[in-house]
Amino acid sequence: MLLLSIESSCDETAASVVRNGREILSNIVASQISIHADYGGVVPEIASRKHLETISIVIEEALRKADLPISAIEGIAVTRGPGLAGALLVGISTAKALAYGLNIPVVGVNHIESHILAIMLESDVKFPFIALAVSGGHTHLYEVQAIGRYRTIGQTLDDAAGEAFDKVAKLMGLPYPGGALIDRLAAEGDPRAIKFPRPLMHEDNYNFSFSGLKTAVLNYVRKNPAAMEGSALNDVCASFQAAVCEVLVSKTRAAVIQSGIKRLVVAGGVACNSGLRRDMATFAETEGAELFIPSPLLCSDNAAMLAVPGDYYLCNNIACGFELDALPVWPLDAISLTGGN
């Protein structure tokens, strides 16, 4: 099947053409980072308006890059949620209009499910596996039995890891988005310079909490103004990043060991972080676990990742049809309960 995928859940407008749910023919992403940087974060109304301005151009470019006419498309997958309601509706309305005009099926897929399954565009990952989905809006651990069968085993109780990165960057005066910049500065710092807390790390569960860590960094920089300059800033970034990564690895290690599932997927925007990738690789080697992390392009928001679940659901006649609407809050467990969508 030649599938057109459309992603507009937050601040990237993306479209992709994928063959048979695995072969990427094009993957186009239009970012709004420079627009939202002036506000220090994503402004939902602005994001929606930019999606409206950009989505047709992005789809046309995806088709051009794939060297295909729109008439060759056999199905459409679109992000249904979770995400910003207005942003989601831009993608959904576009997908439904195209599907209606072309007389082809359309399916709404889960954004986090797509992140978790994106690795299948690059690697042959067998089920079951443990998945850590870690991004600006989510930090969750799942047991994944098959496409459409997910069980949440742990989640953040407050801030997501990516949210913590961006908030800490903002309080230190770093430009938005701050996560990638913290990663770069951390590479030049000493991760042992400052002993920041590791919230919930020693509790007997798989949940996360990062708000206390964020507050600890805030208190430190207020008491130590000199920490905002030069090598001292690098040390703060390195110490903060080390704390986040240690918690993520510790909880994931516990889930892998206690479940007996020695196969792990790390997905989402924070999976681009070099420290997390390194620490996860070290843990996996020590425990004899298979580790799969997508390439950075497939970790950040994109449309190609929708093709893995989208192709599966369409080929198995699990399609939303034209009644699909936005689900700004859409837990993966709900997919399992409804047999797909």
From Swiss-Prot:
Residues binding substrate are 133-137, 166, 179, 183, 273
Task: Please verify whether the record's keywords include Secreted.
Answer: no
| Cofactor note as given | Binds 1 Fe(2+) ion per subunit.
Checking Gene3D superfamilies in the record gives: 3.30.420.40
The alphabetized UniProt keywords are:
Acyltransferase, Cytoplasm, Iron, Metal-binding, Transferase, tRNA processing
- Keyword field contains tRNA processing: yes
- Subcellular location(s) of the protein: Cytoplasm
Q: Name one GO cellular component term.
A: cytoplasm
Domain of life of the source? Bacteria
Instruction: Please name the top-level EC class of this enzyme.
Output: transferase
Identify the cofactor(s): Fe(2+)
Positions that bind Fe cation? 111, 115, 301
Q: Which Pfam families match?
A: TsaD (PF00814)
Q: What is its main location?
A: cytoplasm
What is the catalytic activity of this protein?
L-threonylcarbamoyladenylate + adenosine(37) in tRNA = N(6)-L-threonylcarbamoyladenosine(37) in tRNA + AMP + H(+)
Instruction: Tell me its EC number(s), please.
Output: 2.3.1.234
Instruction: Name its GO BP terms in alphabetical order.
Output: tRNA threonylcarbamoyladenosine modification
GO MF entry, a single one: iron ion binding
Q: Which family does it belong to?
A: Belongs to the KAE1 / TsaD family.
* HAMAP family associated with the record: TsaD
Role description: Required for the formation of a threonylcarbamoyl group on adenosine at position 37 (t(6)A37) in tRNAs that read codons beginning with adenine. Is involved in the transfer of the threonylcarbamoyl moiety of threonylcarbamoyl-AMP (TC-AMP) to the N6 group of A37, together with TsaE and TsaB. TsaD likely plays a direct catalytic role in this reaction.
PANTHER family, A to Z:
TRNA N6-ADENOSINE THREONYLCARBAMOYLTRANSFERASE (PTHR11735), TRNA N6-ADENOSINE THREONYLCARBAMOYLTRANSFERASE, MITOCHONDRIAL (PTHR11735:SF6)
Give the protein's recorded name. tRNA N6-adenosine threonylcarbamoyltransferase
- Organism in which the protein naturally occurs: Geotalea daltonii (strain DSM 22248 / JCM 15807 / FRC-32) (Geobacter daltonii)
Underlying gene: tsaD
